UniProtKB/Swiss-Prot annotation:
Name assigned to this protein: Lantipeptide prochlorosin 4.3
Major place of residence: secreted
Transmembrane region(s): none
Record propeptide residues: 1-64
Originating gene: ProcA4.3
Keywords noted in UniProt: Secreted, Thioether bond
Cited InterPro entries: CHP03798_Ocin (IPR022516), Nif11 (IPR012903)
Species per Swiss-Prot/TrEMBL record: Prochlorococcus marinus (strain MIT 9313)
GO cellular component, one term: extracellular region
Entry PTM: Cross-links are proved in vitro, when coepressed in E.coli with the ProcM lanthionine synthetase.
Induction profile: Down-regulated under nitrogen starvation.
Source taxon at top rank: Bacteria
């Protein structure tokens, strides 16, 4: 997966409330959700690219705010 794929997935999530709700669910499988949305993302990809994402991208993935928290998959809420 390229950084562009990850950023494209994040952009899609930011614009799609259905994806946001799926990612907010307890135990959400980010890789499976991304795959269902047409993206090929692995857990390793998420972990290796996490440090390259801006705070705004991380916060916006699931409609989160800086006062929220991050789950183990890298997405903040």
């Amino acid at each position: 997966m390229s950084e562009e794929q990850l950023k494209a997935f994040i952009a899609k999530v930011q614009a799609d409330t259905s994806l946001q709700e799926q990612l907010k669910a307890e135990g959400a499988d980010v890789v499976a959700i991304a795959k269902a949305a047409g993206f090929t993302i692995t857990t390793e990809d998420l972990n290796s690219h996490r440090q390259n994402l801006t705070d705004d991208e991380l916060e916006g993935v699931a409609g989160g705010t800086a006062s929220g928290g991050c789950d183990t998959s890298m997405f903040c809420y």
